[in-house]
Amino acid sequence: MVDPLALRLANTIRATSSGLTDAFATPESTREWLQTNAAHLGTRMDLDDYLPSEADRAALVELRQNVRAVFAEYVSPQPPSSADAAVLPPFPEALTALNNATAPTQRLLGWGRSGPRTLERVLTADDLDTVMAGLADATVEFFTGPVASQIRTCPAPRCVRYFLKSHPRQEWCSVACGNRARAARHYAQHRED
């Protein structure tokens, strides 16, 4: 199963043995991620010839941080991902920024007492704005769709990912994270002895 676009965007930060890796760290890596996900972006922009400027890359990073803030709000009271919990924008600001990014599309994410819901609006924009709108719209669709209730934060040591819980006994985003968590638990138990 391919993860929804909103989840892939949120998980462009990942933990490796050498620390955090950011898929948007450079214009080249940003272009590679956009090209990989082009079919899901809802844009006619030619991504093969596109190398994001530093401003474009920064705008995509900001959008990702806003999306991660919405993920963090959604999983609460479960703790958010440890990658950026301290540097995420406040939820109301993130929600406004996410909705503003949807401008060329027709969907907005509304948040009421019962949680997320879809609202509509129509505007126009340039190529990068349509890419960002595709990402923002995918996020709105994700949080107002049926799979949002399955979103979890991976509790494994050093993991910073969100994942969809596809099985009642699933606790981690991957087998590797499960192994790392069990090894850490085993080490902690034997260290106390």
Question: What are the residue ranges of the model-derived segments?
Answer:
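Alpha-helical elements of the RecA-like P-loop NTPase motor core of helicases
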Residues: 8, 181-184
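Cys/His/Pro-rich metal-binding microdomains
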Residues: 155-160, 174
